[in-house]
Amino acid sequence: MSKSRRTRSTSRPTSRPQPASCPCGLPEVYEACCGRFHSGAADAPTAALLMRSRYCAFVRRDEAYLLRTWHPRTRPAEVDFDPRMRWTGLEILGTTEGSAFHSAGTVTFRASYRGGALQERSRFERIGGAWVYVDGEFFE
């Protein structure tokens, strides 16, 4: 009586890697979250979402988006990215106004980076219906 040899496949089904969630901290993939704002497909409907999308733009070093969403009155000629800076998280601490029904608003946030964090209260205004960053005040 001969024994037949069975060979067992040791390969596992290949699964596609899951897309990473957006750097802004919301549980959506970048393309469905801040990516749509960065590409120009949509405008951020609130000051808080603009803040998140700008944080994400700093993470991705998207200078064009940052300049496009900066108030013309306070916009710098260029964004000075620190090549050593590694952003690690964003926490929205509070907002005042800044909804689709307002023309101005503030967002207070903590942005963490490798080695520390910064806290800022940012001011936003609407120009032609689109939210733009005006300026911010750092605090501890």
Swiss-Prot record:
Ranges annotated as biased composition (Low complexity): 10-19
Pfam families given in the database record: YchJ_M-like
InterPro entries tied to this protein: NTF2-like_dom_sf, UPF0225, YchJ-like_M
TM helices/strands, residue ranges: none
Annotated spans, Disordered: 1-22
Top-level taxon of the source organism: Bacteria
Family the UniProt entry places it in: Belongs to the UPF0225 family.
UniProt-listed PANTHER family: ADENYLATE CYCLASE-ASSOCIATED CAP C-TERMINAL DOMAIN-CONTAINING PROTEIN, UPF0225 PROTEIN SCO1677
Protein name as annotated: UPF0225 protein SAV_6631
Organism: Streptomyces avermitilis (strain ATCC 31267 / DSM 46492 / JCM 5070 / NBRC 14893 / NCIMB 12804 / NRRL 8165 / MA-4680)
Organism ancestry: Bacteria, Bacillati, Actinomycetota, Actinomycetes, Kitasatosporales
